[in-house]
């Protein structure tokens, strides 16, 4: 997807075009959106499979959360992607170890996430500095065309950059208001 940063910042975060659950916007590269956890990877797997079968070039990128790695459809999709050697499928996992209401491991343990993906015959790239664009770009450069799905496990901190919000599940879906907006903008060096 591609959109200007100003859309995220317009009206102090209110009335922005960027919503919690995006709408389809093919012009800007958003070909599909989901709301419920675990639906993104099955759709992306189908898109990658269709491209492979019709011999169309290009790759399918999908971003999923670590919470989605607790959904059965995620792992079923990996079985399919692996069986059909979908090396045109690039899965980016936002691994912040938190979900809406608790820590990931409190709900369902996900230790050794990289080993889990490798067990499903995926090529894995761990990005320890998930907020560093150079690290992410270097990870993307390591994507292989070796008949395996590619998975980038991007280690992040929920709420990064605003110390009052970091690693606090209360901010999962809560909209900022009043002084919180001022604090957030100050911490992110925004005017």
Name what the model sees in each region.
Residues 13-20, 81-94, 118-122:
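A glycine-rich helix N-cap at a beta->alpha junction
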């Amino acid at each position: 997807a591609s959109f200007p940063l100003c859309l995220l910042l317009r009206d102090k975060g209110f009335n922005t075009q960027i919503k919690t659950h995006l709408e389809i916007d093919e012009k800007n590269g958003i070909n599909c959106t989901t709301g419920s956890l675990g639906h993104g990877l099955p759709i992306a797997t189908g898109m990658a499979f269709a491209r492979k079968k019709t011999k169309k070039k290009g790759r399918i990128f999908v971003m999923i959360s670590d919470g989605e790695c607790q959904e059965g459809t995620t792992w079923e999709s990996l079985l399919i992607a692996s069986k059909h050697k979908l090396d045109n499928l690039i899965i980016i996992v936002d691994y912040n170890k938190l979900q809406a209401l608790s820590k990931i491991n409190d709900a369902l343990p996900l230790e050794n996430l990289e080993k889990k993906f490798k067990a499903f015959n995926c090529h894995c790239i761990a990005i320890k500095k998930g907020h560093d664009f150079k690290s992410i770009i270097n990870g993307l450069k390591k994507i292989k065309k070796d008949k395996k799905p590619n998975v980038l496990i991007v280690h992040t901190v929920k709420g990064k950059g605003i110390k009052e919000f970091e690693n606090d599940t209360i901010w999962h879906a809560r909209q900022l208001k009043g002084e919180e907006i001022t604090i957030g903008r100050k911490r992110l060096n925004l005017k």
